[in-house]
Amino acid sequence: MTTTPDWIMIGGDGPESYNQQSSYQRALLEATKDKMTKAISANLDLDLISNRFIVADFGCASGPNTFVAVQNIIDAVEEKYRRETGQNPADNIEFQVLFNDFSLNDFNTLFQTLPPGRRYFSAGVPGSFFERVLPKESFHIGVMSYAFHFTSKIPKGIMDRDSPLWNKDMQCTGFNPAVKKAYLDQYSIDTKILLDARAEELVPGGLMLLLGSCLRDGVKMSETPKGTVMDFIGESLSDLAKQGVTEQEKVDTFRTSIYFAEQGEIRQIIEENGKFTIEAFEDIIHAKNEFPFDPKTLAISFKAFYGAFISAHFGVEVMRKAFELVEVKAREQISRLHNSKPGMQYLIVLRKN
């Protein structure tokens, strides 16, 4: 499969970087710590814990959230080992963490900010998580945090004006059934390939932990806070085209390879794939709620996540102007955000069959 890493986060450690502007994602990791610990305690076979234990993060970005995720996992494994054997895990287990993301990811910042005093060895694994990136049966627990909503490409026909699948919006809003089906079909194909790859790489009985956002069944993307801000981004780019700051053709050819599936769609895809058993599908109560409805915070947060691939298509200056307009639109239409329907934050625990 050929994949284009359009969604690389803004690297470095500057004020607009993902490293500095991902507190929302980190809050989900903190909210799920106890549930992750219980899930690992209940589902991890102690026989898998030998003198070397491998944890892999797929879609690690540049930190610091990946460090929180893998440390939560290591803490849970050590707690289970200590409780069930009465032994000190530090005497018997060496942990290794594999950090995976596309080769364009800012691995330099990732490794420069590794936590001091960490109790694990670390290695970077560049490559698309839609494909095999590790040897067979080579890791014990994997995690994907806010990376389970990507597709490998834009569905065919979405950007063709002569196609019934023509979508004028930069995202799948959910209001056009044919467009939604095209995105869902592409997401299903990619997710099943991803699950197949992880199933080959996991040891028998190993676990995958998926954390992220999805839609509640029956809710459309543009009805949610996240979808509303995405609409603001698209509207801002269109405004800049009308002002002559960028070309309308560029706006017409810009789409996100992202699909936030409904909860039931995710469950169906995993079950149809058959490589994993769903041990838990938890609805997480996020400490920051769905989003902080502060216009400036919203603009900065979405810039950290989407800014890099908007820059790749339009240039840095257009990207910055677009997010200035996003802040204005969020302020002017704050009631639209307050009246939106909540999305869902989840923790999914999968055991390899």
UniProtKB/Swiss-Prot annotation:
Mg(2+) binds at N167, D252, F254. SUPFAM superfamilies: S-adenosyl-L-methionine-dependent methyltransferases. The keyword Methyltransferase applies. It comes from the Eukaryota. Substrate binds at Y18, Q21, S22, S23, Y24, Q25, Y146, A147, F148, H149, F150, S301, Y306. InterPro entries: MeTrfase_7, MeTrfase_capping, SAM-dependent_MTases_sf. The keyword Electron transport does not apply. One of its GO terms (biological process) is defense response to bacterium. Pfam families: Methyltransf_7 (PF03492). Methyltransferase that may methylate 1,7-paraxanthine. Prevents seed germination and modulates root architecture during early seedlings development. Plays a minor role in defense responses toward pathogenic bacteria (e.g. P.syringae). This is Paraxanthine methyltransferase 1.
